[in-house]
Swiss-Prot record:
Function: Component of the SWR1 complex which mediates the ATP-dependent exchange of histone H2A for the H2A variant HZT1 leading to transcriptional regulation of selected genes by chromatin remodeling. Component of the NuA4 histone acetyltransferase complex which is involved in transcriptional activation of selected genes principally by acetylation of nucleosomal histones H4 and H2A. The NuA4 complex is also involved in DNA repair. Yaf9 may also be required for viability in conditions in which the structural integrity of the spindle is compromised.
An MF annotation (GO) of this entry: histone binding
Subunit structure: Component of the SWR1 chromatin-remodeling complex and of the NuA4 histone acetyltransferase complex.
GO biological process, one term: response to heat
Lineage: Eukaryota, Fungi, Dikarya, Ascomycota, Saccharomycotina
Region (Disordered): 128-158
Keyword Nucleus: yes
Keywords (A to Z) from UniProt: Activator, Chromatin regulator, Coiled coil, Cytoplasm, DNA damage, DNA repair, Nucleus, Transcription, Transcription regulation
Sections of the chain in a coiled coil: 218-254
Subcellular location: Cytoplasm; Nucleus
Annotated GO CC locations: cytoplasm; NuA4 histone acetyltransferase complex; nucleus; Swr1 complex
Protein name listed in UniProt: Protein AF-9 homolog
Length: 254
Protein backbone atom coordinates (compact mmCIF):
# COMPACT_ATOMS: atom_id res chain seq x y z
CA UNK A 1 0.00 0.00 0.00
CA UNK A 2 2.85 2.40 0.77
CA UNK A 3 4.29 2.06 -2.73
CA UNK A 4 0.88 2.83 -4.22
CA UNK A 5 0.37 5.88 -2.00
CA UNK A 6 3.88 7.18 -2.77
CA UNK A 7 3.24 7.23 -6.52
CA UNK A 8 3.04 10.74 -7.92
CA UNK A 9 0.06 11.96 -9.89
CA UNK A 10 1.31 13.33 -13.18
CA UNK A 11 0.14 16.69 -14.59
CA UNK A 12 -1.63 17.65 -11.34
CA UNK A 13 -0.98 20.60 -9.01
CA UNK A 14 -2.76 21.33 -5.77
CA UNK A 15 -2.37 24.39 -3.54
CA UNK A 16 -2.98 25.19 0.12
CA UNK A 17 -3.57 28.87 1.00
CA UNK A 18 -1.59 29.83 4.10
CA UNK A 19 -0.97 32.84 6.31
CA UNK A 20 2.22 33.64 8.16
CA UNK A 21 3.55 36.71 9.91
CA UNK A 22 3.53 38.29 13.32
CA UNK A 23 1.58 40.41 15.77
CA UNK A 24 3.39 42.87 18.06
CA UNK A 25 2.49 45.31 20.81
CA UNK A 26 4.49 47.62 23.06
CA UNK A 27 5.30 46.26 26.49
CA UNK A 28 3.54 48.07 29.31
CA UNK A 29 4.72 47.94 32.93
CA UNK A 30 1.80 45.61 33.64
CA UNK A 31 2.90 43.15 30.95
CA UNK A 32 6.54 43.07 32.00
CA UNK A 33 7.68 40.02 33.90
CA UNK A 34 10.60 39.91 36.34
CA UNK A 35 12.54 37.92 33.72
CA UNK A 36 11.88 40.41 30.88
CA UNK A 37 15.15 42.13 29.88
CA UNK A 38 14.89 45.89 30.55
CA UNK A 39 15.87 46.79 26.97
CA UNK A 40 12.96 44.82 25.48
CA UNK A 41 10.22 47.14 24.23
CA UNK A 42 7.69 44.83 22.56
CA UNK A 43 5.93 41.51 22.91
CA UNK A 44 5.41 39.67 19.63
CA UNK A 45 4.01 36.43 18.26
CA UNK A 46 5.16 34.85 15.00
CA UNK A 47 2.87 32.26 13.43
CA UNK A 48 2.06 29.96 10.52
CA UNK A 49 -1.42 28.62 9.76
CA UNK A 50 -3.73 27.61 6.91
CA UNK A 51 -6.13 30.31 5.72
CA UNK A 52 -9.07 28.11 6.63
CA UNK A 53 -8.87 27.64 10.38
CA UNK A 54 -10.67 24.29 10.43
CA UNK A 55 -8.15 22.60 8.13
CA UNK A 56 -5.98 20.03 9.91
CA UNK A 57 -2.54 19.75 8.32
CA UNK A 58 -1.06 17.44 10.97
CA UNK A 59 -1.40 14.34 8.73
CA UNK A 60 0.89 16.16 6.30
CA UNK A 61 3.10 18.31 8.56
CA UNK A 62 5.24 16.59 11.19
CA UNK A 63 6.50 19.81 12.80
CA UNK A 64 7.11 23.51 12.23
CA UNK A 65 10.34 25.16 13.37
CA UNK A 66 10.92 28.87 13.91
CA UNK A 67 14.55 30.04 13.80
CA UNK A 68 14.81 33.26 15.80
CA UNK A 69 17.72 35.67 16.13
CA UNK A 70 20.79 33.95 17.55
CA UNK A 71 20.74 36.15 20.66
CA UNK A 72 17.62 34.36 21.92
CA UNK A 73 18.00 31.39 24.21
CA UNK A 74 17.20 28.25 22.23
CA UNK A 75 16.76 30.18 18.95
CA UNK A 76 15.22 27.22 17.09
CA UNK A 77 11.73 26.57 18.44
CA UNK A 78 9.91 23.38 17.43
CA UNK A 79 6.14 22.84 17.41
CA UNK A 80 4.66 19.46 16.54
CA UNK A 81 0.99 20.46 16.69
CA UNK A 82 -1.05 23.62 16.09
CA UNK A 83 -1.21 26.42 16.87
CA UNK A 84 2.16 26.87 15.19
CA UNK A 85 3.31 30.06 16.86
CA UNK A 86 6.02 31.45 19.14
CA UNK A 87 5.63 34.38 21.55
CA UNK A 88 8.65 36.36 22.72
CA UNK A 89 9.75 39.85 23.72
CA UNK A 90 12.43 41.98 22.10
CA UNK A 91 13.53 45.41 20.96
CA UNK A 92 14.56 44.93 17.32
CA UNK A 93 13.29 43.60 14.02
CA UNK A 94 15.02 40.67 12.32
CA UNK A 95 14.40 37.82 9.90
CA UNK A 96 12.72 34.66 11.15
CA UNK A 97 13.03 31.39 9.25
CA UNK A 98 9.86 29.28 9.34
CA UNK A 99 10.38 25.71 8.19
CA UNK A 100 7.65 23.16 7.53
CA UNK A 101 8.79 19.58 8.03
CA UNK A 102 6.51 17.15 6.24
CA UNK A 103 5.82 13.69 7.56
CA UNK A 104 8.83 11.62 6.52
CA UNK A 105 8.10 8.90 4.49
CA UNK A 106 7.69 6.61 1.76
CA UNK A 107 5.97 4.42 4.34
CA UNK A 108 3.28 7.09 4.69
CA UNK A 109 3.27 7.81 0.99
CA UNK A 110 3.92 11.53 1.48
CA UNK A 111 7.57 11.97 0.52
CA UNK A 112 7.46 15.77 0.07
CA UNK A 113 10.42 18.11 0.49
CA UNK A 114 10.47 20.53 3.40
CA UNK A 115 9.23 24.06 2.81
CA UNK A 116 11.10 27.12 4.09
CA UNK A 117 9.76 30.66 4.52
CA UNK A 118 11.53 33.88 5.50
CA UNK A 119 9.54 36.42 7.50
CA UNK A 120 10.77 39.88 8.48
CA UNK A 121 9.55 40.49 12.04
CA UNK A 122 7.69 43.81 12.29
CA UNK A 123 7.34 45.69 15.57
CA UNK A 124 6.46 49.10 14.11
CA UNK A 125 3.86 50.27 11.57
CA UNK A 126 5.37 50.79 8.16
CA UNK A 127 5.93 54.47 7.39
CA UNK A 128 8.01 55.12 4.28
CA UNK A 129 7.94 58.87 4.97
CA UNK A 130 9.58 58.56 8.39
CA UNK A 131 13.02 60.21 8.64
CA UNK A 132 15.92 57.79 8.61
CA UNK A 133 16.86 58.69 12.18
CA UNK A 134 13.44 57.59 13.38
CA UNK A 135 13.50 54.20 11.68
CA UNK A 136 13.37 51.26 14.11
CA UNK A 137 16.64 49.63 15.07
CA UNK A 138 17.30 46.20 13.66
CA UNK A 139 19.06 43.34 15.38
CA UNK A 140 21.75 42.11 13.01
CA UNK A 141 22.79 38.49 12.71
CA UNK A 142 26.23 37.48 11.50
CA UNK A 143 24.99 34.10 10.36
CA UNK A 144 23.62 33.98 6.83
CA UNK A 145 20.26 32.20 6.44
CA UNK A 146 20.37 28.92 4.54
CA UNK A 147 19.17 28.75 0.98
CA UNK A 148 15.43 28.45 0.50
CA UNK A 149 14.18 24.94 -0.14
CA UNK A 150 10.63 24.47 -1.30
CA UNK A 151 8.41 21.45 -0.94
CA UNK A 152 6.01 23.41 -3.08
CA UNK A 153 6.17 26.76 -4.78
CA UNK A 154 5.24 30.04 -3.17
CA UNK A 155 2.86 32.56 -4.68
CA UNK A 156 2.89 35.37 -2.16
CA UNK A 157 0.52 38.26 -2.69
CA UNK A 158 2.11 40.74 -0.32
CA UNK A 159 2.56 41.71 3.28
CA UNK A 160 -0.31 43.53 4.95
CA UNK A 161 0.94 45.68 7.84
CA UNK A 162 -1.74 47.30 9.96
CA UNK A 163 -1.76 49.17 13.26
CA UNK A 164 -4.86 48.90 15.41
CA UNK A 165 -6.18 51.56 17.76
CA UNK A 166 -4.66 49.82 20.77
CA UNK A 167 -1.20 50.00 19.16
CA UNK A 168 -1.02 46.39 17.99
CA UNK A 169 0.95 45.92 14.78
CA UNK A 170 -0.07 43.07 12.47
CA UNK A 171 2.25 41.97 9.67
CA UNK A 172 0.51 39.18 7.78
CA UNK A 173 1.41 37.62 4.45
CA UNK A 174 -0.73 35.38 2.25
CA UNK A 175 1.01 32.63 0.34
CA UNK A 176 0.25 29.23 -1.14
CA UNK A 177 1.93 25.87 -0.78
CA UNK A 178 1.82 24.44 -4.28
CA UNK A 179 2.44 20.73 -4.70
CA UNK A 180 3.30 19.80 -8.26
CA UNK A 181 2.67 16.14 -9.07
CA UNK A 182 1.88 15.27 -5.44
CA UNK A 183 1.94 11.73 -4.15
CA UNK A 184 -1.41 9.99 -3.99
CA UNK A 185 -1.35 10.20 -0.20
CA UNK A 186 -0.63 13.94 -0.22
CA UNK A 187 -3.42 14.45 -2.75
CA UNK A 188 -5.79 12.41 -0.58
CA UNK A 189 -4.98 14.52 2.50
CA UNK A 190 -5.37 17.82 0.69
CA UNK A 191 -8.64 16.90 -1.01
CA UNK A 192 -10.38 15.50 2.05
CA UNK A 193 -11.61 19.08 2.63
CA UNK A 194 -11.74 22.12 0.31
CA UNK A 195 -8.41 23.49 1.59
CA UNK A 196 -7.79 25.84 -1.33
CA UNK A 197 -10.95 27.92 -1.02
CA UNK A 198 -10.43 31.42 0.35
CA UNK A 199 -13.43 32.56 2.43
CA UNK A 200 -15.43 35.61 1.41
CA UNK A 201 -16.28 36.66 4.96
CA UNK A 202 -14.42 36.95 8.24
CA UNK A 203 -15.13 34.33 10.87
CA UNK A 204 -15.04 37.15 13.43
CA UNK A 205 -15.01 40.90 12.76
CA UNK A 206 -12.39 41.36 15.48
CA UNK A 207 -10.00 39.17 13.45
CA UNK A 208 -9.77 41.61 10.55
CA UNK A 209 -5.98 41.84 10.88
CA UNK A 210 -5.50 38.10 11.34
CA UNK A 211 -7.49 36.56 8.49
CA UNK A 212 -7.35 36.71 4.72
CA UNK A 213 -10.54 36.79 2.68
CA UNK A 214 -11.34 36.88 -1.03
CA UNK A 215 -11.90 40.69 -1.16
CA UNK A 216 -8.31 41.14 0.09
CA UNK A 217 -7.05 39.26 -2.95
CA UNK A 218 -9.26 41.33 -5.26
CA UNK A 219 -8.05 44.57 -3.64
CA UNK A 220 -4.44 43.48 -4.02
CA UNK A 221 -4.94 42.63 -7.69
CA UNK A 222 -6.59 46.01 -8.26
CA UNK A 223 -3.64 47.78 -6.62
CA UNK A 224 -1.26 45.80 -8.80
CA UNK A 225 -3.19 46.87 -11.91
CA UNK A 226 -2.91 50.51 -10.85
CA UNK A 227 0.86 50.27 -10.37
CA UNK A 228 1.28 48.37 -13.64
CA UNK A 229 -0.51 51.22 -15.41
CA UNK A 230 1.77 53.72 -13.66
CA UNK A 231 4.85 51.82 -14.79
CA UNK A 232 3.55 51.68 -18.36
CA UNK A 233 2.89 55.42 -18.29
CA UNK A 234 6.37 56.13 -16.95
CA UNK A 235 7.91 53.96 -19.68
CA UNK A 236 5.92 55.89 -22.29
CA UNK A 237 7.04 59.21 -20.79
CA UNK A 238 10.67 58.11 -20.84
CA UNK A 239 10.31 56.93 -24.44
CA UNK A 240 8.88 60.31 -25.51
CA UNK A 241 11.62 62.15 -23.63
CA UNK A 242 14.24 60.03 -25.36
CA UNK A 243 12.73 60.87 -28.78
CA UNK A 244 12.86 64.60 -27.97
CA UNK A 245 16.50 64.34 -26.92
CA UNK A 246 17.31 62.50 -30.14
CA UNK A 247 15.60 65.24 -32.16
CA UNK A 248 17.57 67.93 -30.29
CA UNK A 249 20.78 65.99 -30.91
CA UNK A 250 20.09 65.78 -34.66
CA UNK A 251 19.25 69.49 -34.77
CA UNK A 252 22.57 70.38 -33.14
CA UNK A 253 24.50 68.22 -35.62
CA UNK A 254 22.97 69.90 -38.67
Amino acid sequence: MSSTHSRRIKFVSISVPILYGNHAIKLTPEKRKPTTPPEHTHEWTVFFKPVLGDIDLTPLIKKVTFKLHETYENPVRTLESPPYQVTETGWGEFEIIIKLHFQPGVELGINEKNFQIFHALKLHPYNPQAPQAQQPQVQQSQAQPPQQQFGGEGGSVGTVIRERENGEVHSVLYDELVFNEPTEKTFEILTSKPVNLIPYKLSNLDKRDQEYIRPDEIDELNRMDIYIDKVKQEIENQRNQYKLLEQEKLALLQ
